[in-house]
């Protein structure tokens, strides 16, 4: 033990929208408390992944322990638990907030409250955290701290009389923030005597020690060598190492209630140590686990195929390695008639999907082909059983099912009021249902719509940004499933269904999507020696067709004059050959055609 009583421990996190300066603020706090020497300091110290620093987002959680001597002369231990700010990782945010007693709400003085900040603030309020508003970037010429404070009070309803004006970049207000954490964030409850309960708020895989679990000890204490049990999975392990993060790991002998640290116990996979699970001792089990544990369910699926088949084994190995660190990633082998061998992968959301794809391409040098993202549909069969369908080609035929339900999300958009019209129009075209609209301070508005997730996953975000010149921010939450008139649109090339091009669309949009798809494919598929029909069909009913004409060789070139029957014979022979070729010939569908389908769905 570090010799600090529980009453002098403070656990807090930082809530902020992307780019509002959360990581820079964390850096300043580490410097101010002397946790990191000037020599070790580098920007965004807690964002350890190269991709995180480049995109400026925090994906995996980090934690750091700081020793701070306050103005009252006492030594305090401050545990900063970093949170990812992005909507796909809401569950991870909620777990890291559950590990704290307080939170700094960081808002950019020139931007104001954004949608994702709101979502995370609500999570913090659900966990009864003490929230300290911090208005960051007040050194910017466009900073309007008074407007932003008024907006926070109006939108969130927080009392901002004690809001701290700061600039993490220049170092203004850092001392005040540390003092506010000491004075306003309540200390953890002193429950050392109770049975051990530790909340896992993050875990990652280490090649030498197995899975390293980041925990907040809620009740009791734990020592190196103790036998522990994970309450959700029931697995038992022996602790090989305990320690605290200053951001680098430092081993200690024991951790007590209120402390934040890490433990290693030769755990083989991150799946066995799920975020939100409760750890307790084998010989003195806690009567019940900590509340709030949920299995992470993938919401968006897509096919990943290596562009050359000899990379299949490498792709499999790369996915397995990513899975060690990312329990929410799901994948299973898939065979496609057009693309060969690959994997069907499931993700939490769009950003999660992009990050995984980018990491596969960047860290493992893979060249990937990605099919259009789809969502999970619930299909009720004639016998009353319900199945989940994540791949359009697996949808049962119409005579075997009674209904298809699609996932619906509640989307909250915060935007300047002059763009309200175009954004409402966008939501209407995406089959949205209008729910609510509020005017905020200074000409900003929140819109709330219910939209099918399938319409959001393709390109809703990009279109939203382009229609509002980048000023809108959005956040979405799953609210459940709803039945609708959905059909599977198949693409037939030369009479054969190409499974990778099948999509599930709303019946009202099927004709439009089918027509534009076949027109696009006609441009991309090269001409063959025989004519190739491209059809879009719902079941057996063809709703759109284009034909690629055959390449024609002039068989009469060698006939000079001569009898017409001779020419006719050659033409008939060519016609017969074409017929035979059409019956046995295969159509080569180039890679660009599949990419075009993705782009088309985004238009």
Swiss-Prot record:
Reaction equations catalysed: GTP + H2O = GDP + phosphate + H(+)
GO cellular component terms listed in the entry, alphabetical order: plasma membrane
UniProt cross-references to Pfam families, sorted A to Z: EFG_C, GTP_EFTU, GTP_EFTU_D2, LepA_C
GO molecular function list: GTP binding; GTPase activity; ribosome binding
Listed EC numbers: 3.6.5.n1
SUPFAM superfamilies per record: EF-G C-terminal domain-like, P-loop containing nucleoside triphosphate hydrolases
Residue ranges occupied by any tr-type G domain in the UniProt entry: 7-189
Gene3D superfamilies: 3.30.70.240, Elongation factor 4, C-terminal domain, Elongation Factor G (Translational Gtpase), domain 3, P-loop containing nucleotide triphosphate hydrolases, Translation factors
Keyword line: Cell inner membrane, Cell membrane, GTP-binding, Hydrolase, Membrane, Nucleotide-binding, Protein biosynthesis
Entry-linked SMART domains: EFG_C
Binding-site positions, GTP: 19-24, 136-139
InterPro entries registered for this protein in UniProt: EF-4, EFG_III/V, EFG_V-like, EFTu-like_2, G_TR_CS, GUFP, LepA_C_sf, LepA_CTD
UniProt keyword annotation of Cell membrane present: yes
Protein's job: Required for accurate and efficient protein synthesis under certain stress conditions. May act as a fidelity factor of the translation reaction, by catalyzing a one-codon backward translocation of tRNAs on improperly translocated ribosomes. Back-translocation proceeds from a post-translocation (POST) complex to a pre-translocation (PRE) complex, thus giving elongation factor G a second chance to translocate the tRNAs correctly. Binds to ribosomes in a GTP-dependent manner.
Protein name according to UniProt: Elongation factor 4
Natural source organism: Synechococcus sp. (strain JA-2-3B'a(2-13))
Gene it is expressed from: lepA
